[in-house]
A protein has these predicted regions:
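Hydrophobic mid-bilayer segments of alpha-helices in multi-pass membrane transport proteins
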Residues: 1-2, 16-32, 80-88, 188-198, ...
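Interfacial/capping segments of alpha-helical transmembrane domains
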Residues: 15, 19, 31-63, 212-214, ...
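Short amphipathic alpha-helical coupling elements at transmembrane boundaries
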Residues: 44-54, 101-115, 127, 141-144, ...
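Hydrophobic alpha-helical hairpins/lids featuring a short glycine-rich hinge
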Residues: 55-116
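Juxtamembrane inter-helical linkers in multi-pass membrane proteins
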Residues: 103-138, 211-230, 272-278, 300-305
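Alpha-helical membrane segments and immediately flanking helix-loop junctions
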Residues: 113-174, 297-358
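Long, contiguous bundles of hydrophobic transmembrane helices that form the permeation core
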Residues: 192-241
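Transmembrane helical segments that form the transport core of multi-pass membrane transport proteins
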Residues: 236-321
Length: 358
């Protein structure tokens, strides 16, 4: 938090009450979501994820036949179809007004505690379940009138969280590291904690009392004309996301390999991963990771920032389970949870720029 203060555009206008509220809300969310009395809720979510993965496998098996049956854990056949199915399901839940109901509850807390307008609260809360570009779409009519602080809240919340479809897709990649841990539970907790955190950092960097008009939820929720429209549009959006993820992974991994090849000419032991490990090791140590594990953890954090969370989590999942202690593995599960990377900045600028050209 202290590192953010020099970046503020108006240090004297910072509302310290909002910062205190944000920290208290994060502690409250963490206490509720990590307490034993919600175990049954997360157990139900875990079972739902297993059923969803199984159902997706049925569809993938029908389409690819023996290719999928011979290679069920190939990324393109395992993770990408899950993104498509989850996107379709999210659209359907939105049309049935189940997701808006949950999001409204979160946005109500943001409105009352942080004196935020309905649109930005709604958009920030939506990031817990949908992607960084989809969330601003829900409040598109209000974007052109939002203050810099409100836009920063939307963008920061988008980069600090991961969508429900990506959340479930990544959970399967980490089974090697967390055999007895409900990964989806921690992904959901990390995303929910990131919403008040995003508001806090925006309050520090762009303090402002400007509030947009109250959102008209009755009209703005009607994105789809019917259930079939939600299914088809949700599937199409999921396909676009899956194709983008696949394309970015191919390009990014190829570029990393090229950079490593060039660095290898200088020294056989030199690589982009090793450089990033030393750069981010102090940050990992500050997060509570022992110094003897900080360089390895820093490599993952650096890879996530330079490439994306998919590359980082895939690399994390491929490590030997004994490389990190249990504490370090859980810390890294939270630290890597978010769309924050250089490509996301471009995605957000182009996405929000297209929705509100001014």
């Amino acid at each position: 938090i202290a590192l953010t203060f020099p970046l503020s555009n108006n240090f004297k206008a910072i509302n310290y009450k909002n910062i205190l509220y944000a920290i208290l809300v994060m502690f409250l969310f963490a206490f509720i979501l990590l307490n034993n009395f919600v175990n049954q809720f997360f157990e139900a979510i875990s079972n739902g994820v297993a059923k969803l993965s199984s159902a997706t496998a049925e569809g993938t098996s029908f389409l690819f036949g023996s290719l999928f049956e011979s290679h069920p854990y190939v990324f393109a056949l395992n993770v990408l179809p899950l993104i498509i199915v989850m996107s379709c399901l999210s659209a359907l839940l939105w049309h049935w007004r189940i997701l808006p109901l949950i999001i409204k509850g979160l946005s109500y807390v943001c409105e009352k505690l942080f004196n935020l307008g309905g649109p930005v609260s709604f958009g920030a809360a939506a990031n817990v379940f949908v992607g960084q570009v989809e969330a601003p779409l829900f409040v598109r009519p209000y974007l052109q009138n939002m203050s810099k602080k409100e836009l920063l809240i939307l963008m920061t919340a988008g980069m600090a969280t991961i969508s429900g479809s990506v959340m479930i897709a990544l959970a399967g990649q980490l089974e090697n590291q967390f055999a007895d841990l409900n990964v989806v539970r921690h992904f959901l907790t990390a995303s929910m904690l990131s919403v008040p955190a995003a508001i806090m950092y925006a309050e520090i960097m762009y303090p402002s009392n400007d509030v947009t008009n109250t959102i008209n939820t009755e009209t703005d929720e009607k994105i789809y004309k019917g259930s079939m429209d939600a299914i088809t549009k949700g599937t199409r959006d999921g396909l676009n996301i899956a194709v983008n993820v696949a394309a970015i992974l191919i390009a990014v991994l190829a570029l990393v390999s090229i950079v490593d090849g060039v660095l290898g000419l200088i020294s056989a032991n030199l690589s982009l991963q090793s450089i990033l490990g030393y750069v981010f090791a102090p940050i990992c140590w500050l997060m509570g990771i022992p110094w003897n594990e900080a360089i390895g953890a820093g490599e993952l954090l650096g890879i996530k920032l330079a490439t994306n969370e998919f590359v980082a989590y895939i690399q994390f999942g491929s490590l030997d389970p004994d490389v990190f202690s249990e504490k370090t593995k859980v810390i890294m599960l939270y630290a890597l949870c978010g769309f924050a990377n250089f490509s996301s900045v471009g995605i957000l600028i182009s996405g929000i720029g297209a929705m509100a050209e001014n």
